[in-house]
Design a protein with these regions (language model features):
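Conserved non-cysteine loop/helix-boundary elements of the Radical SAM core domain that shape
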Residues: 1-159, 163-220, 224, 374-378
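Structured core elements
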Residues: 96, 119-123, 191-195, 238-240, ...
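Aromatic/hydrophobic pocket-lining residues that form π-stacking "cages" and hydrophobic walls in ligand
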Residues: 147, 229, 388
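C-terminal accessory regions of radical SAM enzymes
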Residues: 213-336
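Glycine-rich phosphate/pyrophosphate-binding loop shared by adenosine-nucleotide-utilizing enzymes
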Residues: 321-326, 342, 351-354
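Conserved acetyl-CoA binding element of GNAT-fold acetyltransferases
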Residues: 350-376
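Conserved acetyl-CoA-binding loop-helix of GNAT-fold acetyltransferases
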Residues: 372-390
Length: 395
């Protein structure tokens, strides 16, 4: 890392005591003293309290590219660290980059691949043009669709942020919008964060709240929308989160329940039982640390089409449809790859090649090269890869 012109050697943190790690941070110009950190942020924090600037503006001011101790590295530095990471005692197994759909293009995705990114989170928020415009989201559904298409061809996992109760939205519209996200071939994210809009003092939404042009959904409306979304979610999509990390004291009006997901899933369970339609969403079916007999598991291939790929979601499931592990196999349409190669030049894959975008087996994480009896150590991941290889060869 480049810290003010001084080259600081990288330390193997796994074999250093706390004092040595603290010394390393000090040398790099990174304070770890709580009082020092509080003083550095005090003025910006006060401006946020007074509504003079937003949290995002304060973060840019404190940690943006012009901040004096900002660290930099070349792509060669990154590549060397990737090599070290392969055999490290504590490995980084994924890098997630969050961005906007209109910032996703071949150039930016090529850089993200070079950085080692494995998943892209994009702020979709809505697919309704009226709602997007009302909330000053300067992206169109077409741009969002193009972002998903490119992410798939580059082999990334896609993680969409989606919001309910935005300015201009209604509960029925929100539910319909989400169904489009998870059923229209142009979108189909691998993961979703469903965030109810929160009213925070100092934001532009306060004026609409004051004049009555926006109101927070009541609990029945909000839980109804989110439960409908859970039921609409296909078996290859995971709802990773359902609430933002705002303290209840910062929320002027609207949902303040920290257990909102519990409430929503209880309602979704009731509706699923009434309609005899099981919940397919991944997180609802995860085995996590539960014990499983290997003989009870079945390998199921859920195949689906997107706008530019043929996808196979391979999953190990119990007789109750609980999920012990899964793999995402992507078979890009050859003509889509060839078209991008013609217009963009170099491309990460060739026509006819397949990609495994994700492999995940549930259970306790074991030490590298260690053994165990949970799902991760029974060859489930290897069997998923072998089956994916067979499908790709036969395609």
């Amino acid at each position: 890392a480049d810290t003010g012109g001084r080259c600081v050697a990288t330390l193997d943190f796994a074999h250093q005591n706390e004092a040595e790690r603290r010394a390393f941070y000090d040398e790099a110009g990174i304070s770890h003293n709580p009082e020092t950190l509080a003083r550095a942020c005090a003025k910006a924090q006060q401006r946020v309290y007074e509504g003079k600037e937003s949290h995002a503006q304060a973060i840019r001011e404190l940690y943006g590219e012009n901040y004096p101790w900002q660290q930099t590295a070349t792509l060669d530095d990154v590549s060397r660290e990737h090599g070290r990471n392969v055999n490290a005692a504590h490995r980084n197994v994924g890098l997630v980059i969050e961005t906007r759909p209109d910032s996703i293009n071949c150039k930016s995705l090529t850089l993200m691949r070079a950085l080692g990114c494995t998943k892209i989170q994009m702020g979709v928020q809505s697919l309704n043009e009226h709602v997007l415009e009302a909330n000053k989201r300067h992206t169109s559904p077409e741009q969002i669709a193009q972002a998903f298409a490119l992410c798939r061809l580059f082999g990334f996992k896609s993680h969409a942020h989606f919001m309910a109760n935005l300015l201009g939205a209604q509960p029925d519209d929100d539910a319909s919008d989400f169904r489009t996200l998870v059923s229209d071939k142009r979108f189909l994210p691998d993961e979703v964060k469903m965030y109810p809009c929160a009213l925070i003092d100092g934001t532009g939404l306060m004026a609409h709240y004051a004049d009555g042009t926006w109101r927070p959904y009541n609990e029945r409306e909000l839980v109804g929308v989110l439960a409908d979304n859970v039921l609409a979610t296909p078996p290859y999509t995971r709802i990773s989160r359902m609430i933002r990390d705002f303290s209840s004291g910062d929320i002027v009006d609207g949902n303040k329940k920290v257990n909102l997901r519990e409430v929503v899933e209880a309602q979704a369970d009731r509706l699923a039982a009434q309609n005899d339609v099981p919940i397919q969403e991944i997180r609802h079916r995860e085995l996590a640390g539960a014990q499983t007999e290997i003989g009870e598991l079945s390998l199921v291939d859920f195949e689906y089409e997107t706008s530019n790929t043929n996808e196979h979601f391979l999953q190990w499931v119990t007789p109750e449809n609980r999920i012990a592990g899964f793999l995402r196999l992507s078979l890009p349409c050859q003509h889509e790859v060839e078209k991008l190669q013609e217009t963009e030049g170099a491309f990460p894959i060739e026509a006819g090649q397949a990609m495994i975008r994700e492999v995940h087996v549930y259970g306790k994480v074991a030490q590298l090269h260690g053994g165990g009896q949970n799902a991760q150590h029974r060859g489930l991941g290897k069997a998923l890869v072998e089956r994916a290889r067979e499908i790709a060869l036969d395609a």
